[in-house]
From Swiss-Prot:
This is Cytochrome P450 monooxygenase vrtK. The keyword Heme applies. Cytochrome P450 monooxygenase; part of the gene cluster that mediates the biosynthesis of viridicatumtoxin, a tetracycline-like fungal meroterpenoid with a unique, fused spirobicyclic ring system. The first step of the pathway is the production of the malonamoyl-CoA starter unit for the polyketide synthase vrtA. The aldolase vrtJ may be involved in the synthesis of the malonamate substrate for malonamoyl-CoA synthetase vrtB. GO terms for molecular function: heme binding; iron ion binding; monooxygenase activity; oxidoreductase activity, acting on paired donors, with incorporation or reduction of molecular oxygen. It comes from Penicillium aethiopicum. Its cofactor is heme.
C-alpha cells in the first residue's frame, strides 16, 4: 500500500515536472522569437521590453509611463519598442502615417484594448471609429466650433467674471489660493452650463462639487483596467483594482446619469450644447442619428471630464511656468495691459490677437500636455507602414509627447520654457525648431473635439487675470511640481498662488467700478467683470 502510494506520488511529481518543463521550453521559445524573429525584432528598445510587458505594465500602474517612455526614446531613438507588440514614436512621419486622414488610405483605428469603455459598454467619442465616430462629431461639431462658442460668449464670460471677483477677494486679503482647484471649478461651471443649462456654482460657492472629485480616480481606474483587459483578465479587476477607484467610477456615471435623465425631460429648447443631441436622440435614438440613453451617459462623462480638466491642466501649467519665469511673466503682462484699455474690450475674439499669450499656451502644452498617453492606434487589417517600417496588425502604436518635447533635434533648449519659439517671427535661436512634431490635440479625424473650447477659455481667463492682477507662486510650491503621475491625464498637485491688485484693479477701485460683496460680478448681463471695492 505504501509502495503504491509512493508510485502515485512519484507519477504526480513527474507530471508536474513535465508540465513545468513544457512551459519553460515554450517560454524560452517565445522569448527567443520576440527578440530575434518577431516582425518588430529590429526596432531598438530595452531588451526586457522586447519579450516582456512587465516594464510597460509597471510604468502604467505607477503612473510613470510617459516619463519612462521619453527616457527610452532619449537612449534608443525616434522609434522604440516598449513592449513585445508596442511601439512609441517621436517623428513627423509617424504623425502623418498613423494619424493623418489621407484619401484612399485606410484609417488606423484606435487600439481596441486601450480606449475607455462605458460602464455598461456603450461607446463614446473617445473610442469610436468610422461612421460611429462621425455620428458623435456631427452632434457636437457646431457647439465646439469657434462660431458656436462665440454664440455662448456671455455664458462663458459670466463664470470667468465670478472667478475674477473671487480672486480679487484673495488678492485684497493677501491669502493664497490653490489655482489647481479653482481652474477646475471654473471649467466645471462653464461646461455644466453649456452642456445642461444647469450650473453647479462651484466658483460662487468656493466648493468642489462631488462629481468633480471622481474624475482623477476614474482616470486611474480606467488605466488600470486597460491592463486587465489586454490580458483577458477583466474578471479579476473587481478584486484587484482598489475599491475606492471602482466606487469613484460608479459615482461618476451616477452623476452623469442623473443629469442626462433630467435633461431628456426638458427637450431641445434650452440653447445649450445638448439641444441637438436631444432632438436627434428622441425615442432612445429612434432616428439612428442621435444617441441612445446609455450613450448619452457616457458622452456626459466625457464632456464634463475633458471640458473641465483639459482646461484646468493648461491653465495650471501656464501659471506654474509664469511663476517660475518672471521675465516671461512681465512680457505677457505688458502685452495684455497694452492691448486693452478696459475690460469691456476683452472677449473671445479680441484675445486671439495676443500673439505672446498664444505662444505661452503652446509652449505650456509642449512641456505639460493636457492629455497624455491617450493616442494609441493600431494598423488596419493586414498591417501598415509607418516611418519607413512595416508594422503588423495588432501592434499598439503611440506618440510620446514627452519624447518629442525633450528631443534637442526638434526643439532648441528643449527643457526650458521659451514661448518665443512659437511666435510668428521667432528669434533666430528657435527658427529651426520642428513645429511639425507638435500636435498636443492629436491629428486627423480623431483629434480633440474640445480644443477650441480649451484654447478660447484659457485665453480669456488668463487675459482677465493678468489685466487686473499680478501674481507669484506661494513659497510652499513643490520644487518638483512638474514631476506628476499621469493616467491618461496628469494627477495635478496643488499650486498655491498669491495674487496682488495690479494698476488696473487699483484704478477701477478708485473710479468706483466694483462688484457686489457676495462675489457676483455686476457686469454679468453684458459679460464683464468689475473689481470689488469693499
Amino acid at each position: 500500500m505504501a509502495f503504491s502510494t509512493y508510485l502515485g506520488s512519484l507519477e504526480s511529481s513527474l507530471v508536474l515536472k513535465g508540465l513545468a518543463g513544457v512551459w519553460l521550453v515554450w517560454y524560452i521559445g517565445r522569448v527567443f522569437y520576440n527578440i530575434f524573429l518577431h516582425p518588430l525584432a529590429n526596432v531598438p528598445g530595452p531588451l526586457l521590453c522586447k519579450f516582456s510587458k512587465i516594464p510597460w505594465d509597471y510604468w502604467q500602474w505607477t503612473g510613470r509611463l510617459p516619463q519612462n517612455t521619453a527616457k527610452v526614446h532619449a537612449k534608443y531613438g525616434e522609434i522604440v519598442r516598449i513592449g513585445p507588440n508596442e511601439l512609441s514614436f517621436t517623428n513627423n512621419a509617424a504623425w502623418n502615417d498613423i494619424f493623418a486622414k489621407v484619401p484612399g488610405r485606410a484609417q488606423w483605428p484606435r487600439h481596441p484594448k486601450r480606449v475607455p469603455q462605458g460602464k455598461n459598454g456603450p461607446q463614446s467619442i473617445m473610442n469610436t471609429a468610422g461612421t460611429y465616430h462621425a455620428r458623435f462629431r456631427r452632434l457636437l461639431n457646431h457647439a465646439f466650433s469657434e462660431k458656436g462658442l462665440q454664440e455662448q460668449q456671455d455664458l462663458i464670460t459670466k463664470y470667468i467674471d465670478i472667478f475674477v471677483s473671487k480672486v480679487d477677494g484673495f488678492a485684497r486679503t493677501g491669502q493664497s489660493l490653490d489655482v489647481t482647484k479653482w481652474f477646475v471649478m471654473v471649467g466645471f461651471d462653464v461646461i455644466s452650463d453649456l452642456g445642461w443649462s444647469e450650473p453647479f456654482n462651484c466658483v460662487e460657492n468656493g466648493e468642489v462639487h462631488e462629481w468633480m472629485k471622481t474624475f482623477a480616480e476614474t482616470a486611474f481606474d480606467t488605466q488600470l483596467k486597460f491592463l486587465f483587459r489586454e490580458r483577458g483578465l477583466m474578471f479579476l479587476a473587481p478584486y484587484l483594482v482598489p475599491m475606492k477607484l471602482q466606487l469613484a467610477r460608479l459615482n461618476n456615471f451616477k452623476y452623469a446619469r442623473a443629469r442626462v435623465e433630467e435633461r431628456i425631460k426638458t427637450g431641445g429648447t434650452r440653447g445649450d450644447f445638448w439641444d441637438k443631441i436631444s432632438v436627434k436622440s428622441a425615442g432612445d435614438n429612434a432616428s439612428g442619428e442621435g444617441l441612445t440613453k446609455e450613450e448619452m451617459v457616457v458622452a456626459a462623462v466625457t464632456l464634463v471630464g475633458t471640458g473641465s480638466h483639459t482646461i484646468s491642466t493648461l491653465l495650471t501649467g501656464l501659471a506654474y511656468f509664469l511663476g517660475t519665469n518672471p521675465h516671461t511673466m512681465k512680457k505677457l503682462v505688458d502685452e495684455i495691459r497694452t492691448s486693452f484699455n478696459s475690460p469691456e474690450e476683452i472677449d473671445l475674439v479680441s484675445v486671439h490677437k495676443l500673439k505672446y499669450l498664444t505662444a505661452c499656451l503652446n509652449e505650456t502644452m509642449r512641456l505639460y500636455p493636457p492629455v497624455i498617453n491617450m493616442l494609441w492606434r493600431t494598423p488596419p487589417q493586414g498591417g501598415g507602414h509607418a516611418s519607413g517600417i512595416f508594422i503588423p496588425e495588432g501592434t499598439g502604436c503611440n506618440m510620446s509627447f514627452f519624447g518629442i518635447a525633450q528631443n534637442p533635434d526638434y526643439f532648441t533648449r528643449p527643457l526650458d520654457f521659451c514661448p518665443e519659439r512659437f511666435l510668428p517671427d521667432p528669434p533666430a535661436e528657435f527658427r529651426d525648431d520642428n513645429h511639425e512634431a507638435y500636435h498636443p490635440f492629436s491629428l486627423g479625424a480623431y483629434n480633440c473635439l474640445g480644443q477650441n473650447l480649451a484654447n478660447a477659455e484659457s485665453r480669456l481667463i488668463m487675459t482677465k487675470l493678468l489685466w487686473y492682477f499680478d501674481f507669484e507662486l506661494d513659497g510652499t510650491v513643490d520644487k518638483d511640481w512638474l514631476d506628476q503621475k499621469s493616467y491618461g491625464v496628469f494627477i495635478k498637485k496643488e499650486l498655491p498662488v498669491k495674487f496682488h491688485p495690479g494698476p488696473n484693479a487699483v484704478r477701477h477701485v478708485a473710479n468706483g467700478n466694483g462688484v457686489a460683496t457676495n462675489g457676483h460680478a455686476n457686469g454679468h448681463a453684458n459679460g464683464h467683470a468689475r473689481i470689488n471695492t469693499k
